[in-house]
Each structure stands twice: as C-alpha cells, then as structure tokens.
C-alpha cells in the first residue's frame, strides 16, 4: 500500500462507480482518503448507498491530469461505516494508452499498465 499512497499525490479527485440492481452503472466524483489499508469516502449519496446494499463491488478511477499521464484504477469492496463509505482495495493499476506500435498477435495488450500491490486484509 506504500506505492499506492505515494501515487495518490498525483491526483486531485476520483470517480466512484457502483452498480445498480438493473446493472446500470452509477458514477460520482469523490475525494477518497487512504486510511491504513482502506479508502474512506465521506457521506456518499443515497443512490451510492442503495447500490452498495445490492452489490458491494466498486471501482475508483482517478483521471490523469493530461493524456500523457496515467489514470489510477482501484477495484474494491465497499461497505458503509456510519455516514462514510469504506473501500477495501482488491486490485490497483496505473493505466494509460500505449503509444501505437505493431503487435504480434491480435490479443496483445495495447495499453501501458503498472500493477500496484494492495493489502488483502482490508
């Protein structure tokens, strides 16, 4: 989680994605705070809370400051703690489009990704 904490300084805010019962994605802008091995999001809205009751899997996406930089994508499990949302990360990756280059196979990855270690004891 040390690498993740260091990387977070590059970003101003994130988008939180939750899934509704009808499999519709709900996305809101948030300012997650890393506390130990989890993210704390203050006072999520009623739709986010309702979605968490149906599906606790969430994704946080910190957009890059420009197209040349990485986005940070964190998948996790969310739960409510009083008026806050707690997200325990299950996967974290820095992601950006890779420069155009020929690939040997049609299934080759065409992105520039860096996996970041996350604690599994959330």
Mark where each language-model region is.
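Short, basic/aromatic recognition patches
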Residues: 1-13
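Short, charged low-complexity intrinsically disordered segments located at boundaries
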Residues: 3, 35-38, 79-84
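Sterically constrained small-residue positions within well-ordered secondary structures
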Residues: 7, 23, 32, 51, ...
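Short beta-strand segments
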Residues: 11-44, 73
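Short, structured beta-strand-loop surface elements
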Residues: 44-106
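Short, cationic low-complexity segments
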Residues: 102-122
